Amino acid sequence: MSALNSLPLPVVRLLAFFHEELSERRLGRVPQTVQLWVGCLLVILISMTFEIPFVALSLAVLFYGIQSNAFYTKFVAILFVVATVLEIGSLFLIYKWSYSEPLIRLVIAGPILMGCMFLMRTHRLGLVFFAVAIVAIYGQTFPAMLDYPEVVVRLTLWCIVVGLYPTLLMTLIGVLWFPSRAISQMHQALNDRLDDAISHLTDSLAPLPETRIEREALALQKLNVFCLADDANWRTQSAWWQSCVATVTYIYSTLNRYDPTSFADSQAIIEFRQKLASEINKLQHAVAEGQCWQSDWRINESEAMAARECNLENICQTLLQLGQMDPNTPPTPAAKPPSMAADAFTNPDYMRYAVKTLLACLICYTFYSGVDWEGIHTCMLTCVIVANPNVGSSYQKMVLRFGGAFCGAILALLFTLLVMPWLDNIVELLFVLAPIFLLGAWIATSSERSSYIGTQMVVTFALATLENVYGPVYDLVEIRDRALGIIIGTVVSAVIYTFVWPESEARTLPQKLAGALGMLSKVMRIPRQQEVTALRTYLQIRIGLHAAFNACEEMCQRVALERQLDSEERALLIARSQTVIRQGRDLLHAWDATWNSAQALDNALQPDRAGQFADALEKYAAGLATALSRSPQITLEETPASQAILPTLLKQEQHVCQLFARLPDWTAPALTPATEQAQGATQ
């Protein structure tokens, strides 16, 4: 700790970030890492044995293709086959008509690149068009390097082998030989979430970060999509399993903030908690066996009173409704999402995005051709790879690409100077490459915030030491050229994306926050009674809220990187947005607490109060886009009915009013000390 205390704060934060990313425990990460690691070693062995060129491209196919489960890997493999046909076909057409005419070649390749970048943003299968764009721009370097059309044709045909044999390899490893099924991952994930819930139910533990809770909830939803596509039994009983996922998510997220020491430990409460933990354990065993859980537990009056006293009645009711649900309930037909974005042909940002990418590539190509520097062809690839919809995400990708390239170049330099002179055969080479590929695979299977570093590190290392050589290489120029090409592409892209039609999310962020608060107002309008349809709707909207708050959090991080904005305005926007996100999460959990009390108080006043809260929240959300939102001030009248039957309900709703009052005032020029103090009071 003393060493960390002496380091600058940004360095400590960076080390904490890498520690979190490298130590992340995600279901399927270890099998995915092993598959990727073994696949890389096999690619090196096959490419060196049969002298197949472009080994870095083969490694890139593996890193993009091997996914966390067998179904996803198979789906991406099919996309890669389609992409290979499209990209090689487009290259041959370009060469056929314009091989000896660079200007005409660019005139033909330009619209192809623009079309691919446009479809990458607007089409569901954007990955296919991204691959076509990469090869279309990379293929323009072949005629510049070689004066013989026959050799260029052979290299282009080799690209088919280079793209398809790693695809076959990853299909054999990840789908046929050592598959990691989504259904098994789902069962394990549900059990892990229930384990965490039981721990917080029985012991006083510190709550996990809300961002982690939201990521786990989103991971369950993604696994549910894969299970629906990959498992017939899951599809047959999909209504029950989807309800199970929603229930587990609710129990996990709600009990995360639960503290059993906050309530009196009467004998009735202790016995009820034990009974509830026992039912959750039964659900775990059923899920582990892939069976739909059925419960015969019927809560009696004393148990209901104990549940209400310790704020567990709503969790108990959601669990019981799942246990009494018919496994053969027909699923609700899901609406098929459109293949294209709804505003694909009306929003000018998509076409501007394609034009900006083309402009960056043309600038790099002009420089690359003008200086006749063959080794920096990676500058054009960089322009396509770092092209993202907005300035913040583009900067994120630039940092990841530069960081990965820097690490890969350093490893390549050390490898060439210290290791390469001592190698005599392919076996020794594989033993030396194994730890490098293992590190790259582990980083590449982390979260989206850092995974690209692993991919870029391995690809840069391979470009500098293994590309088109089948024996020892001692040329340090390759390392320099590849790294400089990436730096040039990054600088050009940064300038273009910052000053040419910059897509800032500063205006989108308040709208995103308004959408999240709008969903929260819908939650408040749902009747707080034990009715099956209302409760299921409540659970589904809660999952949507997790996704909405997580998306707002990520957007805040991207807006923080938009240096073209005024620093004070950017800091104020981020501070207000983070306060809204934090208060929104607290409001959701506070509203959960009111359900336990409101269910026992069945009178006409409760919908009126809920509507009052929802109206105030909707009014606040409506003013976010124009920065006219003020902190809602709500006053509740004490009613004899609520005070006589459940005095805790009024206290819970008054706490909701206090959270409303702590929402930031967007009309003020800056955050006031009182607001900051109110924020701290909620921690």
Model-found features: residue ranges?
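Membrane-entry segments of alpha-helical transmembrane domains in multi-pass membrane proteins
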Residues: 26-31, 46-52, 74-82, 97-104, ...
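Pore- and pathway-forming membrane helices of multi-pass small-molecule/ion transporters and channels
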Residues: 9-18, 33-74, 84-89, 106-173, ...
